[in-house]
Amino acid sequence: GRRPCCNECGICDRSLDPMCICEDLVPQCHEGCQACEEVDTGTPMYQCRSFEYYHCGTPCL
C-alpha cells in the first residue's frame, strides 16, 4: 500500500527502512494505523501512536 504522509516524524527505529511514530495531529488516522489515539485540542484530533512506515517530511494536503 501507499505510505501515508507525515509532516513531523518523531521516534524512528534504526532499521534500513525505518518505521516511525508520526507526531502529526490529524482529523482521522490513516488506514493501517495500529494504535490511533484521540487527542483533545478543543476539536477531536487523532494521532497514530504505533510505529508505521511513513513518507517523513511530506506535508499532508
Swiss-Prot record:
GO molecular function, one term: serine-type endopeptidase inhibitor activity
InterPro entries attached to this UniProt entry: Bowman-Birk_prot_inh, Prot_inh_BBI
Disulfide topology: 5-60, 6-22, 9-56, 12-20, 29-36, 33-48
Tissue spec. comment: Expressed in bulb (at protein level).
Keywords: Disulfide bond, Protease inhibitor, Serine protease inhibitor
One cellular-component annotation, GO: extracellular region
A Pfam match: Bowman-Birk_leg
KW Disulfide bond (keyword) present: yes
Residues under site feature: Reactive bond for trypsin: 14-15
Family statement drawn from the similarity comment of this UniProt entry: Belongs to the Bowman-Birk serine protease inhibitor family.
Task performed by this protein: Serine protease inhibitor. Inhibits trypsin (Ki = 41 nM) and weakly inhibits chymotrypsin (Ki = 410 nM). Does not inhibit bacterial subtilisin.
Protein name stated in the entry: Bowman-Birk type proteinase inhibitor B5
Source organism of the structure: Hyacinthus orientalis
Lineage of origin: Eukaryota, Viridiplantae, Streptophyta, Embryophyta, Tracheophyta
